[in-house]
Amino acid sequence: MIIEVRAKNCYAFEDDITFSMKADMRNKKFGANVHKENNFNVLKTVGIYGPNNAGKKCLIKCIRAIRNVLLNKKNGLMPNIFTDSDVCELGVTFMASGRKFSYDFKYDAEKEEYIYESFSEIFKDQYNNEKGVCWLKKDTVSEIYECIDESVQNMISVVSKNNLLCYVVDTSKFEHINEMKQILVGFAEKIDIINMNNIPMQHTIELMKNKNQLQQKVVEFIKNADLYMDNFEYVDMDKIQLKTGEGDEKPDEKVLDIPENIMDQIRLVSTYKGVHVPSMMFDSTGTKKIAAIASYVIEALEQGRILVVDELDSSIHFKLTRAIVAMFNNELNTSAQMIFTVHDIDLMDCKRMFRKEQIWFVHKDEEGVYVYSLADFTAQQGVRDTTDVMEKYRKGALGALPDPELINSLLSIKSGVKGDDADAK
């Protein structure tokens, strides 16, 4: 589970930002929303609010870059365009098998080199104080090299900088570096990142092909989201009833249309009053998106995965988004986690759904981009457990709100039309 994400000079973030999923246990409200293990307390869900083009997506890009780096994939990192530095800095603190770890790296985007990386395990003593034990530190700029495997320490300074240390040495020969790699890769492999505006149906299709308990839970999830649906399944073509011409139709939504797998899509059917119809052609956009996200949600809950969702509320009824969040906040969820961006303020509910530290904002002004939590606002600033947070946000008291001047655009359009009419006369 992710505990903290750190970034500097990455995408929209010029200065240091910290996104934390650490629970404040002084607050006893909604205890089921917190995963508790070995005296570490981690939030199961976090919702991120903010106007368009403020930096919400950039925060997700940072998580994706961390995952890709740890999996030895193309990282896609870009330094902030307003700085002279080419060095992107990223870090993550996470839980794995009941243990807490921290990993940081610096990447020179111009030279395509990893100039710094460090990995440590964090322990808590009997007084609840945290202490880090360094496993690896490679700082090629300051020429500081440390490794818990002494035989590795002597070679760090001469290995290539075009990748992480664990990918440029044979880790099987070094006990701790090998364990470090397994921990980092295992953590990264549990992260799924999806965009509800461009969510692939293929993940659900592949899962629907296999008749097992996971598939049954996905079907129940989809049926419960659509009260009029009798069943949802992957069937043989001869079971699909199409009228003349309907087989040539394609889905309206290009984001849900995968031409090379169109036959798979047609075989994914919904059943209404005993009639099988291709879901991609007949179901609403919202139902199709529910079907697409269903496999990710069920897999996350069943397998303890980390689901990162951009625009969770896109084309989905607010009661369904609340239900999805509630599944992760439920006390029966012992290891899954969800991070999502959202615009729907109906989810900003600290009276029935969220702890204050579960609501985050991304705010942008002329000076920069800021990432902060609702928990950063104190009672003295007018934010208490009984406060109507939605109303506070509507009024702009919490920031991270767009300030559109669309009325000025309308007036300029109107005045332009009048001017054109006058010229014509």
Regions found by a protein language model. Give the residues of each.
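Short alpha-helix of the ABC ATPase nucleotide-binding domain corresponding to the H-loop/switch region
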Residues: 317-322
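Conserved P-loop NTP-binding catalytic core
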Residues: 39-47, 51, 60-110
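C-terminal lobe/lid and adjacent interdomain/linker elements of RecA-like ASCE P-loop ATPase modules
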Residues: 1-4, 303, 323-425
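P-loop NTPase motor core
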Residues: 84-148, 362, 374-387, 391
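Extended helical coiled-coil dimerization/tether regions that scaffold
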Residues: 8, 199-282, 402-404, 408-425
